[in-house]
């Protein structure tokens, strides 16, 4: 792959972005409202990257992301990611999330159990997912709170965006948490 670049691309949920380096995708950016804001977010996150045409492996990943966000089930688990700067705990969490198929969900506690942690680590799992640099490719939106509650989501629109992504994939979540959840 070419050295550090980024590109914007249209999806059914809005204009997204992707940044890449020699070892794979560095990050995915969900829509920020318009091209200017999405581009600015990518430039802040990846100051070493310049806007350019994506190389073939990235174009292939973008096509799969576009299809998934249009409601076509796609497996993105083979998309090459550049794990530089991702901690060991986060990587374990992201690898479990990558294995969740479209239309399915796991709870934060179930992810914690799958990486060998106690249920008390569910909050740590949520924090790791909140730092996910690869949304959609690492489908953090498929991890929900206990009882099917949506839980948080760090992208623009918060839990409403998470619920929209789950609906596109045909998954169910109970909605945003209330004061009593």
Where are these regions (language model features)?
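Basic nucleic-acid-binding alpha-helical/helix-turn surface characteristic of O6-alkylguanine DNA
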Residues: 1-120, 168-181
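Helix-turn-helix DNA-binding helix
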Residues: 121-125
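N-terminal alpha-helical segment
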Residues: 93, 145-146
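…primarily DNA-binding HTH/wHTH and HhH modules…
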Residues: 146-181
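Major-groove DNA-recognition helix of helix-turn-helix-type DNA-binding domains
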Residues: 131, 137-138
